[in-house]
Amino acid sequence: MTSPSIESGARERTRRAILDAAMLVLADHPTAALGDIAAAAGVGRSTVHRYYPERTDLLRALARHVHDLSNAAIERADPTSGPVDAALRRVVESQLDLGPIVLFVYYEPSILADPELAAYFDIGDEAIVEVLNRASTERPEYPPGWARRVFWALMQAGYEAAKDGMPRHQIVDAIMTSLTSGIITLPRT
């Protein structure tokens, strides 16, 4: 007889293999079939269905998994310590390392339509907001939360640039320059 801890360990490894495979497959092929994900995970399609009976179940689990990875990356980047520019750079690098699956998760209609997931996504980046607030100057023309929106928009541009093959260091530098200096210099009149 198998002990419960061994069984749950094997079950967790299988679950993780399915989620990791889904991250890789769906980032490149958003409409990929569950069979493609199963093959990438090294399991049968019936195994995927045992863990995630419907595609939406897998997508919900994937969304939570990616969001949790993002939060863990934020924590590892330690954005509350050190000079603000170094803290921002560490956060940008940590988020960029998650790759294009972030675009899929945050733009997949079936995920966006889930109010529970929307609430779940709205937490976790408080440390980023804190470092952005440390770096930002009060600008009355900016609505509340603007720096956060700009940060995530630049990250989206970074994920897209990475998919297009732009070197990582150029992406990080471009995001940092955009955050700290902007991208447009108007002629002085």
Swiss-Prot record:
InterPro entries: Homeodomain-like_sf, HTH-type_TetR-like_transc_reg, HTH_TetR. Gene3D superfamilies: Tetracycline Repressor, domain 2. Residues 12-70 form the HTH tetR-type domain. Repressor activity is regulated by binding of different substrates of the LfrA multidrug efflux pump, such as acriflavine, proflavine, ethidium bromide and rhodamine 123. Binding of these ligands causes the dissociation of LfrR from the promoter, inducing lfrA expression. Residues 70-71 are annotated as: Proflavine binding. The keyword Transcription regulation applies. Keywords: DNA-binding, Repressor, Transcription, Transcription regulation. It holds the Pfam family TetR_N. GO terms for molecular function: DNA-binding transcription factor activity; transcription cis-regulatory region binding. Residues 33-52 bind DNA. Homodimer. Forms a structurally asymmetric homodimer exhibiting local unfolding and a blocked drug-binding site. This is HTH-type transcriptional repressor LfrR. It comes from Mycolicibacterium smegmatis (strain ATCC 700084 / mc(2)155) (Mycobacterium smegmatis). The gene is lfrR.
